[in-house]
């Protein structure tokens, strides 16, 4: 069998890694070995943080809802319990959006929750 030279494939593979490492600092975008390590690490970070992002946004929504709820004399947990008792199904993302952009609508929801808790 004739000898197979893999120069073209190797060069393409290295070029692909260096292209992915574009914008990295120092030798991390120049040297293949270091760039490859950093590209692998970056992929791990990206994979982890795609899941972390969902948790981070939920935390942010809860913080915003809690702040607006306390302006209405309720804690976050009591507000959510009151909304559940009154049959209002609004997710945390929408509640947080109301708390930031439409405080009067949020206040109406908080009043409904308060009324249900006082029963």
Swiss-Prot record:
GO terms for cellular component: ribonucleoprotein complex; ribosome. GO terms for biological process: ribosomal large subunit assembly; translation. One of its GO terms (molecular function) is rRNA binding. Pfam families: Ribosomal_L20. Gene3D superfamilies: 6.10.160.10, Ribosomal protein L20. PROSITE patterns: RIBOSOMAL_L20. InterPro entries: Ribosomal_bL20, RIBOSOMAL_L20_CS, Ribosomal_protein_bL20_C. It comes from the Bacteria. Keywords: Ribonucleoprotein, Ribosomal protein, RNA-binding, rRNA-binding. HAMAP family: Ribosomal_bL20. Belongs to the bacterial ribosomal protein bL20 family. Binds directly to 23S ribosomal RNA and is necessary for the in vitro assembly process of the 50S ribosomal subunit. It is not involved in the protein synthesizing functions of that subunit. This is Large ribosomal subunit protein bL20. It comes from Bacillus pumilus (strain SAFR-032). The lineage of its organism: Bacteria, Bacillati, Bacillota, Bacilli, Bacillales. The gene is rplT.
